[in-house]
Amino acid sequence: MAFASPPASPPDEDGQARAPRYPGEDTTPTSRQEIWGWYAYGIAAEVFAVCGVGSFLPLTLEQLARERGFLQSSHLPCVGPDSPSAPKESSPAMFRRDDTNEQCVVGLMGLEINTASFAMYTFSLAVLVQALTLISFSALADYENNRKTLLVTFGFIGSATSMLFVFIAPPVFVLGALLVVVGVVCLGSSFVVLNSFLPVLVASDPSIQNSNKESAAELHRLDPEAEYVHARTSFDGDEPTHRPPTGLGLGGATGTSSPELQLSTKISSKGVGLGYCAAVFVQILSILLLFTLSKTSISKASGTLPLRFVLLLVGIWWFSFTMVSRRWLRNRPGPPLESTSTGASSHQPRWRIWLHLVAFAWKSLWKTVKIALKLREVIVFLVAWFLLSDAMATVSGTAILFARTELKMSTTMVALLSITATLSGMAGAFLWPIVSRYFGLKSNHTIMVCIALFELIPLYGMLAYIPLFKKWGVIGLQQPWEIYPLAIVHGVVSGGLSSYCRSFFGLLIPPGMEAAFYALYAATDKGSSFIGPAIVGVLIDATGQVRSGFFFIAVLIVLPIPLVWMVDAEKGRKEGLKISEDVVRGGEGEDEEVEGLLAR
């Protein structure tokens, strides 16, 4: 497959690469083609994140289980000519609403599980496995040629899982759950590896070569109003303090005047924007594909077959743009695996060195936790982030299944719902900085406003339990059209929370420990996001209604508000600065533990 290269970047001013920091480092100046290779993977994988994980995978899992399931009350098939939900009209399945209100369950390991719960449990398991994988293997990306190899491998395997859904029929619906777990793990892992490219590309960019030569290795604090874009989201904290500035999170300048920060923010923001634009484009293509298939006999053969063709399209897209990244990205190798920093000897077999890296990653994370326990403001905010990230993940998954099973919305309507939320999220990322400046809000106050608006979503859904509204048949998410305004709220709020929480946490990090603490931040995010979906799944099984999960979600969303309010950013900055100064002075006693984390 051939791809046209973007315009070549102009040569750097002095025409010389910077000095290598370890044997074998590729210090070739970053080209525009390589930057576009980095963008290409975001364009590839973000489509699976939005169109797959965020839209069609939950629908496909639920529908696969539904076509294999039976009604709990009568034990009649949920789908088929003998089902109470058998269509009375000739409209295609993806445009048709299922008006039955009986609970559909499927037998699994001797249990009767609601088909919506099956999807929730699957994604809960997928996120848990993803978190364990990220913590265990993210350190491998920093050594030898593993960075590009892992990125391409995760991309190819992940895209294959999406394409393989075309072969998953209802009798083997459990295999669909397995593909989801593998796909989600590959998606999250590949984004971690992709982020690890960013500081390398920034460090070798010709535009900052001269500034790096002239700058001193000085610690700067983060501007409260700036968005911190960390250098990498690897879960290891093995960045030595004596290394020269290589970008964000590596001990270099992190203030708004830092050339590395400005360039990294520019590249990262453009990458996110391109990824979301690609996701919206493929989502529109998916709707057109569903519409086209509705004119054929395919839609009548199986309710999941059109969905599986959409996942095939998503997988092909992911694979194709991964090929672009494979061609345009340089290897950018890291230090040799036998580096003594991993605690492994060069005489050991390769697999033992890899095991040392896995153990090293977990020990590094644990050391970071012990350091964080000394910082009250960091701990309070991480607890708030633990709850908030779980709430965000739970709302996203619950909303799709609620639209499908409770509101009986068609596949096309749900796809439009996803597009609405995605476009609103893009708008929210630009809107909240303007709102914050206009009203003079501090970062934590902006987060609290976002959470308060987020709380409106489950509260509105709970209004349907009020007899008056229930009698009206409208208000409280009883009609399909009601969910679209809430999708706008969800998108706008999510865009603000994602950026402001990361930025606010950056204020509390001890200078020079950015990589380790953002690893802890990411671990908290992924480590919590499996709890909420699992609990909602249990509630659905107990009540037979997805709506019952709104009670739990409402409590989960509101809990972080007092915690965020309690965080004193100025006190947290002083605490972080004190620990950082102890490290710079060499540390004494317990502070040697901090230094060990950064200098191993």
UniProtKB/Swiss-Prot annotation:
Subcellular location(s) per record: Vacuole membrane
Family: Belongs to the ATG22 family.
GO cellular component: vacuolar membrane
Biological role: Vacuolar effluxer which mediate the efflux of amino acids resulting from autophagic degradation. The release of autophagic amino acids allows the maintenance of protein synthesis and viability during nitrogen starvation.
Name of the protein: Autophagy-related protein 22-2
InterPro entries the UniProt entry points to: Atg22, Atg22-like, ATG22/LtaA_families, MFS_trans_sf
Regions that span the bilayer: 41-61, 117-137, 149-168, 186-206, 271-291, 304-324, 378-398, 414-434, 449-469, 484-506, 526-546, 549-569
Membrane topology: Multi-pass membrane protein
Glycan attachment residues as annotated in the record: N444
UniProt region (Disordered), positions on chain: 1-30, 234-257
One biological process term in Gene Ontology: amino acid transmembrane export from vacuole
Keywords: Amino-acid transport, Autophagy, Glycoprotein, Membrane, Transmembrane, Transmembrane helix, Transport, Vacuole
Keyword Glycoprotein recorded: yes
Main subcellular localisation: membrane
Pfam families from the UniProt entry: ATG22
